[in-house]
């Protein structure tokens, strides 16, 4: 029931679907006259990038301040989370390299459909890698001086800043449907439905990567490291995985994840909470895979050769930028612009992915929840 006089809020998922359909219709009716709507779509990316840089900084620092992780358990959790993320990125990059886009789509035509140059290009460029290094150094310093009055005051200030930035990002995310409408109107107005095969290929690429990561890599970890039956694990994990797919958030799925780990999988409460509560700031395999795939995909669309060093940088940025953003709305979308821009790829490509991001966001959440549960089982094996 809703209070009298108040209309029920339309779910964001439904808003995004309606915006996609409405944008396609508007573009087909307006034709080239809808091109100006692409500028509005890129303005959304500009604002998101401006918020994302300080958000990543304070999120990493806050993780150091608030996380309580015993060293013995950290020696298992941290390397395992890093290994999972690297494997996820490697799968994404491998699939992206194996995909001959030019066979399916007229890439030269699509490059002309990207929204115009970003206003953010006229702002001072920020090196995300140095932002992350500064955040790590600040977090380590606060952790080393924990208990002192200045450290406590600064820690509280960081927590307050994180809450404010998350609220601002939440406000910006509410206008995602408008950005989706704008980019769909521009693209369909300029090329009809030529963009849809490209988006379909991208969705299949990411979905295939996540399926390989979950069904093959996690199965290997369960069988040979955690000494658990993968078939039984995935049967027990059905509830939290379906919940994550439905709500699109690993954090919102946390109560179901914990209940499944402790009651159905018989994982100890300590291991379950360490992996699913503390580890939720680290286990972002879905986001890492998505962003690595997106970066290589954009590079192919724009015919930009990414050398090995740049690909390693993509992986590093995706992993480090995801630390501490578990509770941020549309976390993968928030950090995507930073990763894309961090390796010199055109930010104009980001709005082109917006029409399918709502769908992939649910796959990201499901992969992240699976990661939490696999890590919990491995931790319990070495308890």
Segments the model singles out, each with a brief description of its role:
Residues 71-77, 167-171, 264-280, 308-310, ...:
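Membrane-interface alpha-helices at helix entry/exit sites of multi-pass transporters
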Residues 239-322, 376-377:
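Helix-loop-helix junctions within the multi-pass membrane cores of secondary transporters/permeases
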Residues 292-383:
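Transmembrane alpha-helical segments and their short flanking loops
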Residues 38-46, 156-171, 232-243, 259-266, ...:
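Short amphipathic alpha-helical coupling elements at transmembrane boundaries
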Residues 77-88, 200-217, 236-243, 312-325, ...:
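Small-residue-enriched core segments of transmembrane alpha-helices in multipass membrane transport
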Residues 47, 82, 86-90, 207, ...:
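Hydrophobic transmembrane alpha-helical segments of multi-pass transport and channel proteins
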Residues 1-60, 66:
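Anchoring transmembrane alpha helix of integral membrane proteins
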Residues 7-28, 45-48, 72-231:
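Signature of multi-pass transmembrane helix bundles
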């Amino acid at each position: 029931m809703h209070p009298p006089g108040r209309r029920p809020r339309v779910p964001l998922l439904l808003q995004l679907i309606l915006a996609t359909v409405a944008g396609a219709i508007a573009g087909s009716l307006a034709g080239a006259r809808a091109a100006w709507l692409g500028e509005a779509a890129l303005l959304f990316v500009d604002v998101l990038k401006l918020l994302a840089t300080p958000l990543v900084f304070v999120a990493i620092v806050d993780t150091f301040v608030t996380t309580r992780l015993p060293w013995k358990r950290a020696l298992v959790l941290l390397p395992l989370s890093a290994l999972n993320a690297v494997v996820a990125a490697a799968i994404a990059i491998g699939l992206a390299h194996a995909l001959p886009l030019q066979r399916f789509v007229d890439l030269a035509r699509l490059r002309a459909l990207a929204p115009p140059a970003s206003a953010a290009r006229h702002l001072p460029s920020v090196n995300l890698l140095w932002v992350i290094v500064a955040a790590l150094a600040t977090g380590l310093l606060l952790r080393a001086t924990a208990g002192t009055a200045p450290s406590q005051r600064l820690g509280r200030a960081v927590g307050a800043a994180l809450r404010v930035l998350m609220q601002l990002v939440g406000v910006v995310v509410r206008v995602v449907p408008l950005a989706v409408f704008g980019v769909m109107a521009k693209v369909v107005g300029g090329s009809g439905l030529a963009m849809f095969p490209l988006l379909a290929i991208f969705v299949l690429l990411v979905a295939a990567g996540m399926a390989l990561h979950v069904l093959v890599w996690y199965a290997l970890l369960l069988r040979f490291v955690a000494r658990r039956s993968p078939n039984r694990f995935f049967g027990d994990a059905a509830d939290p995985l379906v919940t994550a797919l439905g709500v699109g958030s690993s954090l919102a799925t946390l109560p179901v994840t914990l209940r499944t780990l402790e009651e159905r999988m018989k994982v100890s409460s300590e291991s379950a909470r360490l992996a699913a509560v503390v580890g939720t700031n680290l286990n972002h395999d879905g986001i890492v895979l998505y962003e690595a795939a997106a970066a290589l995909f954009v590079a192919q669309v724009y015919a930009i050769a990414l050398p090995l060093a740049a690909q390693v940088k993509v992986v590093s940025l995706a992993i480090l930028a995801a630390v501490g953003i578990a509770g941020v709305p549309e976390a993968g979308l928030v950090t995507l612009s930073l990763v894309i821009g961090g390796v010199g790829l055109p930010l104009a490509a980001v709005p082109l992915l917006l029409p399918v991001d709502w769908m992939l966001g649910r796959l990201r959440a499901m992969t992240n929840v699976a990661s939490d549960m696999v890590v919990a089982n491995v931790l319990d094996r070495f308890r």
